[in-house]
């Protein structure tokens, strides 16, 4: 296909079938120079486009205006723009995504992209968002405020390495969600409010907020948790954390859960029932400012050895407190 001709093509109906992942992917070197922009603004009705890796690895693509594409039949957008490292502007805000089930790796490593408005997308059938925005290191504005991913099951590393995003509105219904491992890892969010999320299933929170060094405020929903390894490891700006609405009855590994939370002073885990066989190694390593932990007596005696200066702690009336230095 001549891509210059494609950019100026009249109204066309395309049936790309199940081989659509070959559409533009991996265009490099001299060929890619023909695809530094893609601006087909004429009516392009795609009657069958089920597996869309279309622009994956188009490393020279800088601008794409695909607003006129008819995407109503698409079920899979995985890796569509992944590794488009030069992409700075993308116009797909009006795409019909009502049948899409897979958004994994959609914008993964779009490291030049600065703004995305996807608020009009219907994501009600989406089941996986693994790595969706991972590696979008320059992304400063992301509007997904109207999303309601009510079928979502997994969002592993969804926002990992989003180093330029400071805030994000996520008023979601997530009653089927099971996996949030590394979801916000290595990002620079200052505030995250997940309080309205519904989490009816046991969630994998391992490494979820790993190395979120700027995270100061976190609101979490009622949750049944199954994995907590290194969940808050490296959250060095958190001062207070309320996790009293988490059920951890089935968690077996708490290793390094709060490691490196060097500003954390108050922790509320009063509802936690930690299994006597659970691994808690390194749970509070580096939490040198921790003074108060709201917890049951049973929990206190299971984790007190992991507290900094553990011999200086006492428990009374559902509160573990570090003794004042004389």
Label each region the model flagged.
Residues 19-21, 52-54, 73-80, 99-107, ...:
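Consensus positions within tandem repeat domains that build extended binding/scaffold surfaces
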Residues 1-3, 325-326:
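Universal eukaryotic N-terminal targeting presequences
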Residues 304-326:
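C-terminal capping region of solenoid repeat domains
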Residues 24-25, 259:
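Acidic, Ser/Thr
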Residues 277-282, 304-307:
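A short acidic (Asp/Glu
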Residues 2-17, 27-50, 60-73, 86-99, ...:
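Structural signature of tandem-repeat unit edges
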